[in-house]
């Protein structure tokens, strides 16, 4: 019957494409080591890591050298903007240094990747503030571990008129949002808004399409 067909199909699927493929012990230890390191990167499974490792082996030596130099230089020389905590080549990032942007509006995000996602929409012309994560008691991340005090210092200077909270809708994200709201109550002159919740629960901005992000920003609501 149908159940039998499905059982056979699932059996074949598991044989052909195991959920968590591992490299045979008979394979080169060097290949295993490189694949293991590559699979530590977010979004890279063992199968993709194996393909990348083999591709690296086929690349021209100069290309591999350029790649490793770029990674070394990035890790050595990259800075965090003193104002917003965004990644930058200089002490102040290009966004904060851009006088044509709206310096009265700040969009608060969790990670640098969120800045890139919003910038790709080309619809937002204000500034940003990167928290560096979300409050998570389970992971031992307290408010003091994030760049929240730096945000409050920026607001206290009196230039900012609106703070947009673009935090994920996870439990940790909601916890962070409510904590920020409590801290921002001491600045009644600042309008506090939150992006529209068209973004699904638990979704991170980094993985949301540009159209949805644009809609969420344009339809942000004020939080009383």
Where are these regions (language model features)?
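A short alpha->loop->secondary-structure connector
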Residues: 121-128, 136, 182-189
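Basic, flexible Lys/Arg- and Gly-enriched helix-loop patches that mediate nucleic-acid binding at interfaces
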Residues: 81-84, 95-97, 124-126, 130-153
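Acidic beta-strand-to-loop metal/phosphate-binding motif
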Residues: 105, 109-110, 160-172
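Conserved phosphate-handling catalytic cores of large alpha/beta enzymes
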Residues: 189-193, 204-224
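N-terminal targeting leaders
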Residues: 1-20
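Short Gly/Thr/Asp-enriched flexible loops that form oxyanion-binding sites at enzyme active sites
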Residues: 172-185
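Cys/His-rich Zn2+-binding cysteine-cluster or related metal-binding knuckle/ribbon modules and their
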Residues: 25-31, 40, 50-115
């Amino acid at each position: 019957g149908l159940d039998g067909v499905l059982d056979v199909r699932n059996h074949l699927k598991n044989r052909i494409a195991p959920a968590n493929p591992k490299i045979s012990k008979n394979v080169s230890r060097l290949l295993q080591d490189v694949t293991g390191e590559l699979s530590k990167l977010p979004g890279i499974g063992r199968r993709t890591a194996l393909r990348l490792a083999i591709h690296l082996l086929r690349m021209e030596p100069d290309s591999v050298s350029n790649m490793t130099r770029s990674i070394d230089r990035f890790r050595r020389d990259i800075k965090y903007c003193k104002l917003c905590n965004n990644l930058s080549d200089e002490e102040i990032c290009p966004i904060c240094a851009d006088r044509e942007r709206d310096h009265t509006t700040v969009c608060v995000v969790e990670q640098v990747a969120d800045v890139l996602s919003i910038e790709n929409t080309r619809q937002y012309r204000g500034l940003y503030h990167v928290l560096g994560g979300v409050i998570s008691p389970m992971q031992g991340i307290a408010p003091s571990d994030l760049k929240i005090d730096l945000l409050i210092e920026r607001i206290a200077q009196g230039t900012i008129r609106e703070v947009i909270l673009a935090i994920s809708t996870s439990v940790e994200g909601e916890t962070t949002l409510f904590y920020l709201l409590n801290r921002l109550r001491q600045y009644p002159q600042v309008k506090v808004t939150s992006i529209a919740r068209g973004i699904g629960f638990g979704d991170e901005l980094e993985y949301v399409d540009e159209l949805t992000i644009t809609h969420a920003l344009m339809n942000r609501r004020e939080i009383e």
